Amino acid sequence: MNSGSSYEAMERYLEKNKKPPKALFISSDATAAGILKSIREHGFLVPGDCNIVTYNNTTFSESSTPPLDSIEVYLKESAKEATFALERFWNAEKLPRKIVIPCSLVIRGSIKKQENNGK
């Protein structure tokens, strides 16, 4: 999904539901750009009315308004593990059942902490 199609999708969502979802996990910054534009054009706040986390932590996440919280993915390590898995496969070696590649959450300001209110 790109910025234009995500904008149109959020426009349809807001037309039907009259308010944005409380939170969105968005798979790319290009998608986030369109969604963020639509939400703001309707007068809703990010964070507040809608909280957003993106995936990949590109420069858009850092430079957008507001700066977006994002999952930092370590592509070098992912590529290295994929290469090792392919080598094992080609050599008819047993492949690991699970490969865990760390990631981290970069906090910038697109998530509003919810008040507990004693609950």
Protein language model annotation of sequence segments:
Residues 1-5:
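Short beta->alpha junction loops
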Residues 7, 11, 15-118:
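Flexible loop/turn connectors
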